[in-house]
Amino acid sequence: MTLGSGSSVVVPRNFRLLEELERGEKGIGDGTVSYGMDDGDDIYMRSWTGTIIGPHNTVHEGRIYQLKLFCDKDYPEKPPTVRFHSRINMTCVNHDTGVVDSKKFGVLANWQRQYTMEDILTQLKKEMAASHNRKLVQPPEGTFF
């Protein structure tokens, strides 16, 4: 939204997170990506859980991946920390910790305020289907970092 003076209205962090929570609870697209609060008692809305169902025609097909997203006090000005809880082998994910490397994952590397947790999860799903990730040998299903 733009005002007549040329300045933009900045939606406060908590309102933004409430919007994201509502969208995440309603479901996204084809249902292969979802997210919600990790702890309903967290009044600062910092800890979130995401789920991605692996894309078709890849080694990830049919697998369910759980992720943790942490939105610090400076979100959405800065991106959340994203970590796979489920073990996965991807070029942008640290093999020891499951943390998504912001330098190797475009959405985090080029973060903009209007990006959302939904954008992160949908782009991670697309990254799973990318030629450099779609056939990588994966850890056994059901294993965690």
Swiss-Prot record:
Species per Swiss-Prot/TrEMBL record: Arabidopsis thaliana (Mouse-ear cress)
Lineage: superkingdom: Eukaryota
Family: Belongs to the ubiquitin-conjugating enzyme family.
Tissue occurrence: Expressed in roots, shoots, leaves, stems and flowers, but not in pollen.
An example Gene Ontology biological process: positive regulation of protein polyubiquitination
SUPFAM superfamilies: UBC-like
Lineage: Eukaryota, Viridiplantae, Streptophyta, Embryophyta, Tracheophyta
Function in brief: Has no ubiquitin ligase activity on its own. The heterodimer with UBC catalyzes the synthesis of non-canonical poly-ubiquitin chains that are linked through 'Lys-63'. This type of poly-ubiquitination does not lead to protein degradation by the proteasome. Mediates transcriptional activation of target genes. May play a role in the control of progress through the cell cycle and differentiation. May play a role in the error-free DNA repair pathway and contributes to the survival of cells after DNA damage.
Limits of the UBC core domain: 12-145
Cited Gene3D superfamilies: Ubiquitin Conjugating Enzyme (3.10.110.10)
Gene Ontology cellular component annotations, sorted alphabetically: cytosol; endoplasmic reticulum; UBC13-MMS2 complex
Triggers of expression: Not induced by stresses.
Subunit structure, interactors included: Heterodimer with UBC35 or UBC36.
Protein name as catalogued: Ubiquitin-conjugating enzyme E2 variant 1C
